[in-house]
């Protein structure tokens, strides 16, 4: 009878991609939050508040390779309808050598071009790079001349800031895009905070005039020491400070009597 006959169900093949996706573990928190969550545990949570605040309150870099719309809506000239527009930054690659100079926020743009500018021909990869110059720049605060790789945009920004030191001190880290620039800023802020007498030791009037010129940028020395440090450098600095405090607490304290 038909009811006594067992019919095998058809076997449906499962793609390997589905099996791999099913085997992937589910994370408790989104991957995008991992960097922020790292700052809340372990030695990272014991970093100074002003340093953690500088990591959490990262601002949007100033547009360099594209022109923002500046508005959320625009009128379409073809149909007269209001349409939403969005600023989409161009992805920029900052090579390691950009951290050793001052490129003014410029970097490499990775893209494609058509052979002989013919849209019917093959597309090939292309990298657009900024034009670089070697210039000697002088710092009043550090009283030192630096030979730095710069772009024309950097030179224009220095002129707009009315000086090299003003450019370094006024420009946020998101626009400097340079480890060398942040190290310079830390050195300048430390000298301003300490009112270092080694600056023009034979000319106190000139030294006082320089410190007065940049007095608006003075911050406590304890904060200036952390300016421009990467997270790894800050963690190492915090570890050494904690080890020093632990050693000091273990040393016997001599009685003053």
What are the residue ranges of the model-derived segments?
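N-terminal amphipathic/basic-hydrophobic helices that include classical n-h-c signal peptides
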Residues: 1-21
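Compact, Lys/Arg-rich rRNA/RNP-binding cores from ribosome-related proteins
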Residues: 22-256
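A positional/structural detector of protein chain ends, strongest at the extreme C-terminus
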Residues: 3-4, 255-257
């Amino acid at each position: 009878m038909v009811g006594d006959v067992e019919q095998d169900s058809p076997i449906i093949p499962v793609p390997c991609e589905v099996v791999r996706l099913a085997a992937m573990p589910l994370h408790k928190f989104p991957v995008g939050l991992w960097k922020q969550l790292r700052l809340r545990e372990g030695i990272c949570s014991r970093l100074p508040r002003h340093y953690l605040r500088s990591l959490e309150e990262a601002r949007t870099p100033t547009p360099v390779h594209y022109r923002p719309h500046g508005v959320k809506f625009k009128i379409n000239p073809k149909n007269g309808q209001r349409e939403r527009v969005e600023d989409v930054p161009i992805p920029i690659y900052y090579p390691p050598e950009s951290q050793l100079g001052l490129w003014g926020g410029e970097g490499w743009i990775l893209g494609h071009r058509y052979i002989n500018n013919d849209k019917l021909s093959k597309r090939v990869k292309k990298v657009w790079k900024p034009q670089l110059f070697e210039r000697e720049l002088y710092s009043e605060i550090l009283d030192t001349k630096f030979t730095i790789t710069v772009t024309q945009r950097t030179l224009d920004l220095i002129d707009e800031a009315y000086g090299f030191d003003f450019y370094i001190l006024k420009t946020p880290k998101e626009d400097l895009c340079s480890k060398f620039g942040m190290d310079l800023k830390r050195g300048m802020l430390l000298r301003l905070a300490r009112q270092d007498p080694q600056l023009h030791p034979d000319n106190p009037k000139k030294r006082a005039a320089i410190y007065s010129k940049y007095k608006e940028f003075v911050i406590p020395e304890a904060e200036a020491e952390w300016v421009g440090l990467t997270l790894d450098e800050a963690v190492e600095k915090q570890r050494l400070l904690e080890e020093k405090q632990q050693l000091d607490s273990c040393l016997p304290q001599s009685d003053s009597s």
